[in-house]
Amino acid sequence: MRPRTAKHLGILAIVVAATSAGCSSSSSSKAEPSTSTSTPPTTGPHRTKAGLAKIKHVVIIMQENRSFDSYFGTYPGADGIPSKNGRFTVCLPRPSGPCQAPFHDKYDANSGAGHAHSDAIKDINGGRMNGFVRQAASSRRGCRAVQDPACAHGLQSDVMGYHDAREIPNYWTYAKDFVLNDRMFEPVTAWSLPAHLYMVSAWSAKCASRLASSCRNDITGPYSLKEQQRFVDRAIATGTAPVHDAWTSITYLLHKQHVSWGYYVETGKEPDCADDAATCTAPPQDYKTPGIWNPLPLFTDVQEDGQLKNVQPVESFRAAAKAGKLPAVSWITPAQVHSEHPPASVHAGQAWVTNLVNDVMRGPEWSSTAIFVSWDDWGGFYDHVAPPAVDGNGYGLRVPGLVISPYAKRGYIDHQTLSHDAYLKFIEDVFLDGQRLDPATDGRPDPRPLVRESAPQLGDLANDFDFNQSPRAPEKLSPNPRPGPASSIAG
């Protein structure tokens, strides 16, 4: 346990604001049914600039800590939990006793397991994808604080549990009526902080100065609590903003091209612990306080471009959606209660996402908006697909991905290999004429190991749209839906 408080981040917020005011796993078998509702990617008119130009607003909603198999492992046609004749064929070894097979988890509060870089390596286990139960057992140390995942319900690991339309009917409805990405991978084999850094910059690093060239690859932290405190102490002593994230974020390219953006933070408690500690006293979270789920205020390009004002409370997003004043690009991050991060309520998270989607659908800009919903990391939950290697940092484990738009294909399952880097690629293609976060061309050279958006493995989210179709009418769902039917595969 590493207790923490919000004191150091609260001071940091003041300083930044002041200085910036200017048994075995069978991963090769497929889940039943084998008939997919998807169609192969094409190179037709939906890929043209004219098609992409119909998108004026991109909204990215990033939830917390769920693997693909834990939410969509029994979804018809998706690459889900291995099964045959309606029965699961996978059973993972425990530290002792019989192996653990997948099972339907009816609980709204789940436990999950460790999800640091070292935990990802154990879960993947050299591509065998059979380390989840053993890793969960080794990471559980009893119920010690309300934030401890072990407090959810008993001490039995639930990492092999899955939900279906009974628990997450709206997510399954979005998949049925819009697009489900069944090969969406976390961009990095790590936890929330590196994942959220990748979400806005396609990299995670440590920097020795405010120069981008001083940054060095780091996916395990990249900053410990002691280091964060040193940043604050240095900032107070010198009256300057702390040196922190000096590599280039996507906001730099957007600002150069006069493309509007907003990063919206829900006020409440942070979803997880600093340094991926097992337990902590959850500190407050708000848009004024830089942190794991609010990293952009610590980017030097955001500070130097005078863009701190673009980091706002989530209420500003809702007002903008209602008034027809959405920025071109929006990111939205939840507080603990709506994050779905164990042991937070799955239902509460789904309701929160549904309300955000409904806000856009009720507004005048629905007809020109693409909404992407995903989860920042796998949370220790089982997934059977070994992540592809794109560089030394990832990809990480598979997470769910949903695409909701008036131009989204209906009932389409996208089998392309994707990661959250694909969101940046889509933004760049829609608003920046395909410019990438490339040190050779973006004017802020940093030593990132790879231009992630140009990775040959990475698919293209444009394939999820049909720009020849008329914009689809809004499909507003109840945030408190009735449970859906059980899946056809027995657990």
Regions from the PLM with identified roles:
Residues 23-491:
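N-terminal pro-sequences and low-complexity stem/linker regions of secreted or lumenal proteins
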Residues 2-27:
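Secretory targeting and sorting signals
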